[in-house]
Amino acid sequence: MIELLSAAETWVAVGFAILMVVFVYFGVHRTVLNALDNRRDRIKAELDEASRLKEEAAKLLADYKARAASAEREAEAIIASAKDEAERIAAEAKAKLEDFVARRTKTAEGKIAMAEAQAIADVRAAAANAAVAAASSILSQSVKGSVADELIGKGIAEVRSKLN
């Protein structure tokens, strides 16, 4: 037994046992257990909060993705609408231009036809005047007197009515 009392391990065991008795007497084990329980509860609360935040972040991400997809669809619809509007405006402008060109062409053709008719009328009038002058000159040289004046008047009137 003396050997047992002189061994350092024995005194370490006795000191440890006394320390444990003191801890039990003062309720240190309850304090340690309460501290561990509090830590467990705090960690559980933090994990619950982290889980809630993760779910909230997932919902926000899903909402963001849905909004982004909706915005993309809306942008595509706006682009398609703008393209359709641009095509409609271009077609309308083309139709107006074609109508304008057709009216201008018709007006120009009408002016050309009027100028042509006027030129033909001027040529006919000049030809009639030349024919009247020639007939008058020929008749006045070949026929003399009152008969000549009467024939010349009838001939001139007839030529004018037929040539104009």
From Swiss-Prot:
Its main location: membrane. GO terms for molecular function: proton-transporting ATP synthase activity, rotational mechanism; proton-transporting ATPase activity, rotational mechanism. GO terms for cellular component: plasma membrane; proton-transporting ATP synthase complex. F(1)F(0) ATP synthase produces ATP from ADP in the presence of a proton or sodium gradient. F-type ATPases consist of two structural domains, F(1) containing the extramembraneous catalytic core and F(0) containing the membrane proton channel, linked together by a central stalk and a peripheral stalk. During catalysis, ATP synthesis in the catalytic domain of F(1) is coupled via a rotary mechanism of the central stalk subunits to proton translocation. Component of the F(0) channel, it forms part of the peripheral stalk, linking F(1) to F(0). Belongs to the ATPase B chain family. InterPro entries: ATP_synth_b/b'su_bac/chlpt, ATP_synthase_B_chain. This is ATP synthase subunit b 1.
